[in-house]
Amino acid sequence: MQQAQVLSKDSAVDDLFARFGAAAFVPQPSADNTPTLWVSRERLLDVLSHLKRRFPMLLDLFGMDERLREHRPAAARDFTVVYHLLNIAGREEIRIKVALSDADPAVPSAAQIWPNANWYEREAWDMYGINFSG
């Protein structure tokens, strides 16, 4: 099985940096070489909507409780919501992460972009109390 693209001349990361500016993201290395970027909650829907053209599949969406994690990424806060996107035809994937505080564990819903997000968002709400608005 061929591994997904990481960074190429026309990478999704380069595309995002060109569209939103590199300062809008915090890159995170990953063990599986999947490009992983942290983005603010305020920019999330714009970024996900832009990525939808290139990544038609929301492979996974999940919440993480980071409060007791000892070796967490610098960008993490109390909770993290992770969006794992896939482009089967282009054999590439990307992860987008959003850090949330315990005082305000809310993020806009991605269900209008990928309808299957609704199911994943319900699970994150049930497990961690993360609210998905919209």
Each predicted region: which residue ranges?
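Terminal low-complexity/charged segments
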Residues: M1-G134
